[in-house]
C-alpha cells in the first residue's frame, strides 16, 4: 500500500479519538507463539485504503500463506492450548447490505444469491464478487441489493469527481479524512473497493474496542487480526468454552455478522467446528 499524506497522519495523531491506534496496540502486545519463540506483529493503519498492513521482522502477518506450511510454526503458548480462528462469512456483502439498509435473510449470503442467479454456491460467490468489485450489469440493477449498490457507487463517484485536490472524503465510522490527491488513477469501482476496505477496517476496530475490554478477565489472548478474521490463543483448561462463546457472540453482533470457527494445535492444520456452536 502507498502511505497516506502528512495531512491524514497529522489528523490521526492530533484527534482526540485514538481508538484505531490503541486497539491495534492491544492486539500487538499479546504476541504470537512460534515453535521457537514469542514474536510480535506491528500494524500500520496509514495506508492508501486505511486497511492496516501488518509486518515485522521480515514477516508479513497480513499475508501468511495458507498452503505452503509457513503457518505451521504458530502454536499456542498454553499447555494443551489451541489456536482458534473466527472468520466472518460473506463480510463485505453484509457490510454493504447494512450500510444500504438491505436485510439479508438468515443463512448463507451466497446461497441467497445462488437462488437469484440460478447457479451453485461456488459460482454464486464468484458472481457476487464480480458484480461488487467490478460493474453491476444492467440486468442486475433491478435487484434490490445490486440496484442499491450501483446507485451508491455512482453517488460516491459523483461526489469524488467534484472534489478539488485539497478536499477529502470522510469515512463512515471514524470520519477519517481520505484526501483526493492520494487516491490516484481512480474509477467508480476502484473507489468503491477502497471505501469497502476502509469500512471493513473501521467496523472491525469498532467491534474490537468492545470485545477486548470484555475478554481481559480471561487467560486466553487475541493474537492476530486480518481483515475479516480474528485469531485467538485459547487456554482451554482455564477458560473452557465460556471464552469462545463470549467471543463469538460479541463478534457476530446479535447474529448480524455470522462467523465460521476453526481450531487447531497450529495455525496450518485447522479444523472447522462452526456447527458445534449451533
Residue ranges of model-derived segments:
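Short, charged/polar, Gly/Pro-enriched secondary-structure boundary elements
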Residues: 238-241
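Acidic, glycine-rich two-metal-ion catalytic cores of nucleic acid-processing enzymes
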Residues: 1-119, 176-215, 220-230, 243-250
